[in-house]
């Protein structure tokens, strides 16, 4: 199959990594897969089999010759419909119209979702959200993930414990400011710990002034992230329900990292019973959950055992199996039947 993924940006992010993983797995199966993006190829991802075309979508040769075109963000849907050939899909990793940061363009986002595409969802809850907003049915394909890359040796006993918090602090979706506020509260109570932060963006003035962060890592390459997880003792994932899928939380579970996660559909889908949950957006509850893990070694050990098998249930090859079936079925439906 000639498959094209339309990528809005090659900047480091979990959503971009998911797209590149899907493309690479399908290319390894013999399909002609091209990622088309107006930006240079990402240096942080080891791309081996899939092709990369740096081009405006309107001028893309691969898109003009595609059998399957996959939009991966709301801004790429219209180009996929306008310039793609064959069957057009829309890979949904979160419903952008519900994000506070996209409120000024929410009407444009809804218009993009109304365009004639076959929708793909990472989770059952996201499928429900799309249906509730009038965007029709979506196929749940699951999350592309390689748990083996994050396998970690037993953590040494060390004090103080280090807490890893991932994501951009600006904006509501990731809940990072909720998490940092909770950690500041715990520091004020005299709890001893270190805070490790990782984000694709520079340290913000707000976070610097808060003064709770001990180490800040910017734009860590995908192949270096496992080592950062191994340096931590706890993972804090405070994202809000609008977040379609929290990839760092899954990576933390695969790394045997005890996790305190917000009680959202995405986290329940990825973590099951392998994490300690707290109400999303509740700074006091976040502080209590983190304090529990800081003080309870046995609970940390229990969650560390549960994480890897749970994360191992998400496999890129399973996602590729589903995509191949959907792509072939859609392409057959697009082609006129023989007389």
Residue positions per predicted region:
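Conserved donor-binding/catalytic core segment of Leloir-type glycosyltransferases
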Residues: 4, 120, 155-174, 180-187
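Nucleotide-activated donor-binding/catalytic signature segment of Leloir-type glycosyltransferases, i.e.
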Residues: 203-226
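Acidic anion/phosphate-binding donor-loop and adjacent secondary structure
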Residues: 97-103, 131-132, 140-160
């Amino acid at each position: 199959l000639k498959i094209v993924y339309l990528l809005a940006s090659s900047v480091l992010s979990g959503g971009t990594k998911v797209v590149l993983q899907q493309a690479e797995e399908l290319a390894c199966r013999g399909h002609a897969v091209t990622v088309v993006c107006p930006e240079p190829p990402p240096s942080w991802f080891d791309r081996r089999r899939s092709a990369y075309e740096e081009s405006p979508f309107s001028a893309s040769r691969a898109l003009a010759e595609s059998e399957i075109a996959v939009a991966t963000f709301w801004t790429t849907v219209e180009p996929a419909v306008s310039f793609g050939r064959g069957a057009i899909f829309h890979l949904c990793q979160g419903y952008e119209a519900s994000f506070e940061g996209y409120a000024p363009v929410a009407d444009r986002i809804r218009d993009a979702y109304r365009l004639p595409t076959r929708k793909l969802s990472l989770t059952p809850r996201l499928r429900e959200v799309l249906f509730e907003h009038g965007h029709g049915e979506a196929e749940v394909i699951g999350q592309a993930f390689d748990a083996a890359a994050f396998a970690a040796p037993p953590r040494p006993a060390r004090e103080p414990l280090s807490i890893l918090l991932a994501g951009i602090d600006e904006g509501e979706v990731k809940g990072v400011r909720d998490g940092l506020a909770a950690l500041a509260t715990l520091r004020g109570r005299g709890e001893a710990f270190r805070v490790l932060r990782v984000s694709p963006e520079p340290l913000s003035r707000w976070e610097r002034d808060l003064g709770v962060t001990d180490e800040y890592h910017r734009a860590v390459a995908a192949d270096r992230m496992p080592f950062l997880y191994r340096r931590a003792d706890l993972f804090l994932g405070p994202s809000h329900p609008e977040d379609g899928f929290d990839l760092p939380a899954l990576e933390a579970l695969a790394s045997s990292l005890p996790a305190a996660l917000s009680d959202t559909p995405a986290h329940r889908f990825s973590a099951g019973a392998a994490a300690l949950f707290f109400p999303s957006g509740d700074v006091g509850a976040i502080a209590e959950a983190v304090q529990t893990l800081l003080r309870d070694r046995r609970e940390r050990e229990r969650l560390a055992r549960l994480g890897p098998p749970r994360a191992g249930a998400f496999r890129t090859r399973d996602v590729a199996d589903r995509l191949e079936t959907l792509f072939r079925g859609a392409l057959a439906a697009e082609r006129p039947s023989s007389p």
